[in-house]
From Swiss-Prot:
GO cellular component: a single term: proton-transporting ATP synthase complex
Family matches, as SMART domains: AAA
Taxonomic classification: Eukaryota, Viridiplantae, Streptophyta, Embryophyta, Tracheophyta
Topological type in the membrane: Peripheral membrane protein
Protein name: ATP synthase subunit beta, chloroplastic
Role of this protein: Produces ATP from ADP in the presence of a proton gradient across the membrane. The catalytic sites are hosted primarily by the beta subunits.
Name of the encoding gene: atpB
Family statement: Belongs to the ATPase alpha/beta chains family.
C-alpha cells in the first residue's frame, strides 16, 4: 500500500511520526483499537498492525476505521485475515485513507484491495497514488448530454444500447458467454474509442479470476511481451478473502478508473463482477459493527453504500466511466433488497440466454429480455427506434408461433406468418457476430459493426429485399454485405456439388 507518494519508500519514513494505538478487542475481521486521548484517527483512515503472531511469524494487517466508539476507542475492519493478532499489539494510524497506484502503469497488472500487485511481476512502476474514498463529481462537472456508447456489437447497439457514462446490468448464468462478451467489450473500447478498461472481481471465485486472466493473455487483451500495450487493469478481492477486502475492492477498481477519466481524459469501461457480492460483504461487516439488520438481514446502510459507489460512476466533461456490472439474483427473486437497490441505478440490462447459446447464436444476448432507457426516438432517432421496435415485434411473433410450429409444423401457418418466421430466423442469425477475442478459438476473424451499418442491415431484412437468401448466410457475419456475399458463396458451393 502507498501511504505517502512523496517519500522514496512509501509508507515507511512517515509512519514513525504517526499516532500509535493498541488492539483492545478482536471480533473476527473487526478490531477495536484504543488510542491516547486527543489522538483519535478519522473515519476511513488506514491503520496498520505490525508485529509477530503467536508462531513468531511477521504480520502486516491493514484495517480501515469505520466507527469512533468513545472512550478513545475506534472500531476498524481488517482488509486481510486477522488470524494470529492478539490484544495489546501496536497499531499505527497512517493519517490518511487507503491509497492505491493509478495511471498507465496499472494496465496489464493484477492488484488486491490495497493496490499491491499479486501477479509476481514485480512492483508497479508508478509513484502516483489516489485515495479510494472520494466524493462523486459535482453537478457542474457532469456531462448531461445523453449519448450512445457504441460497442460495435449489433444486438447491443440496436436493441439495448449503452449510455456513455451509464451503468449496465449483465445477467447470465455459467457458460453462456459472459466472459467472452466482457473481453470483446474491453477489446472494442480500446480499438474504437482509444479507451481502457478496469476489471473489479468482487467476491468471485479465485478459479474464475485466474481463468479470465489466462483468457485475456491468450486473446491479446493483456500483452505479455509488452505489458504497457495491455488494455485492462485487474483488481481482485476473491471469495476467500475477509469481508473488508470484498467490501472495498470495488472502490479500488473505481479509483483506478477515475484516474483514466479525470487525468487522462479517456473513455473507461469499468467491469464489476459481482455487484451482489459487494452488498453481501457489507452485510457481513454491518452486524459485527453493531448495526441492527434491516430487511432480509441486510445492512441498514444498503442504499447509502450502493449510492456512494454508483454515483462516482458517471460522465464528466473530461471523460466517461461506463460500468458493466454482473448481477447475481439470489433465488431468482428480483424483489430481494440487493438486486432491487442495484436496479435503481441501471440504465440498461443485457440478459444472456441459455437457449440462444444452445442454438450456437453468440453473443447469446436475449433480444426481448434486454432493455435500455436509451431506446427512445428523441435519443437514438426515429429510424433506429422504429427498426428496433419492428425487430422486437417480429421476434416476439416468432416466439408466440413456436408452440404451433412444434405441434403442427410450418405448413399449417398462414402465408403472412410463414414470412414472419422466415424473417425472424434471419434476424436471429444476423444478431450473431464473430468476436475478435474468439478468433483464436473459432478461426473466424472478428467484426466491429458500426451503428449505421447495423440499422441498414436490419432494415433490408425487414423490408423483404433479402427474403430469397438462405438463413445460414446471416449466421456469424458482420454487416449485411457480408451476408449477401456469403449467400453467393453458398449458392456456388451447392452448384459445384451438383
Amino acid at each position: 500500500m502507498r501511504i505517502n507518494p512523496t517519500t522514496s519508500d512509501p509508507g515507511v519514513s512517515t509512519l514513525e511520526k504517526k499516532n500509535l494505538g493498541r488492539i483492545a478487542q478482536i471480533i473476527g475481521p473487526v478490531l477495536d483499537v484504543a488510542f491516547p486521548p486527543g489522538k483519535m484517527p478519522n473515519i476511513y483512515n488506514a491503520l496498520i498492525v505490525k508485529g509477530r503472531d503467536t508462531a513468531g511469524q511477521p504480520m502486516n494487517v491493514t484495517c480501515e476505521v469505520q466507527q469512533l466508539l468513545g472512550n478513545n476507542r475506534v472500531r476498524a475492519v481488517a482488509m486481510s485475515a486477522t488470524d494470529g493478532l492478539t490484544r495489546g499489539m501496536e497499531v499505527i494510524d497512517t493519517g490518511a485513507p487507503l491509497s492505491v497506484p493509478v495511471g498507465g502503469a496499472t494496465l496489464g497488472r493484477i492488484f488486491n484491495v490495497l493496490g499491491e500487485p499479486v501477479d509476481n511481476l514485480g512492483p508497479v512502476d508508478t509513484r502516483t497514488t489516489s485515495p479510494i474514498h472520494r466524493s462523486a463529481p459535482a453537478f457542474t462537472q457532469l456531462d448531461t448530454k445523453l449519448s450512445i456508447f457504441e460497442t460495435g456489437i449489433k444486438v447491443v447497439d440496436l436493441l439495448a444500447p449503452y449510455r456513455r457514462g451509464g451503468k449496465i446490468g449483465l445477467f447470465g448464468g455459467a457458460g453462456v458467454g459472459k466472459t467472452v462478451l466482457i473481453m470483446e467489450l474491453i477489446n472494442n473500447i480500446a480499438k474504437a474509442h482509444g479507451g481502457v478498461s478496469v476489471f473489479g472481481g468482487v467476491g468471485e471465485r479465485t478459479r474464475e479470476g485466474n481463468d479470465l486472466y489466462m483468457e485475456m493473455k491468450e486473446s491479446g487483451v493483456i500483452n505479455e511481451q509488452n505489458i504497457a500495450e495491455s488494455k485492462v487493469a485487474l483488481v481482485y478481492g476473491q471469495m476467500n478473502e475477509p469481508p473488508g477486502a470484498r467490501m472495498r475492492v470495488g472502490l479500488t477498481a473505481l479509483t483506478m478508473a477515475e484516474y483514466f477519466r479525470d487525468v487522462n481524459e479517456q473513455d473507461v469501461l469499468l467491469f464489476i463482477d459481482n455487484i451482489f457480492r459487494f452488498v453481501q460483504a457489507g452485510s457481513e461487516v454491518s452486524a459485527l459493527l453493531g448495526r441492527m439488520p434491516s430487511a432480509v438481514g441486510y445492512q441498514p446502510t444498503l442504499s447509502t453504500e450502493m449510492g456512494s459507489l454508483q454515483e462516482r460512476i458517471t460522465s464528466t466533461k473530461e471523460g466517461s466511466i461506463t460500468s458493466i456490472q454482473a448481477v447475481y439474483v439470489p433465488a431468482d427473486d428480483l424483489t430481494d433488497p440487493a438486486p432491487a437497490t442495484t436496479f435503481a441505478h441501471l440504465d440498461a440490462t443485457t440478459v444472456l440466454s441459455r437457449g440462444l447459446a444452445a442454438k450456437g447464436i453468440y453473443p447469446a444476448v436475449d433480444p426481448l429480455d434486454s432493455t435500455s432507457t436509451m431506446l427512445q426516438p428523441r435519443i437514438v432517432g426515429e429510424e433506429h427506434y422504429e427498426i428496433a421496435q419492428r425487430v422486437k415485434e417480429t421476434l416476439q411473433r416468432y416466439k408466440e408461433l413456436q408452440d404451433i410450429i412444434a405441434i403442427l409444423g410450418l405448413d399449417e401457418l398462414s402465408e403472412e406468418d410463414r414470412l414472419t418466421v422466415a424473417r425472424a430466423r434471419k434476424i436471429e442469425r444476423f444478431l450473431s457476430q464473430p468476436f475478435f477475442v474468439a478468433e483464436v478459438f473459432t478461426g473466424s476473424p472478428g467484426k466491429y459493426v458500426g451503428l449505421a451499418e447495423t440499422i441498414r442491415g436490419f432494415q433490408l431484412i425487414l423490408s423483404g429485399e433479402l427474403d430469397s437468401l438462405p438463413e445460414q448466410a446471416f449466421y456469424l457475419v458482420g454487416n449485411i454485405d457480408e451476408a449477401t456475399a456469403k449467400a453467393m458463396n453458398l449458392e456456388m458451393e451447392s452448384k459445384l456439388k451438383k
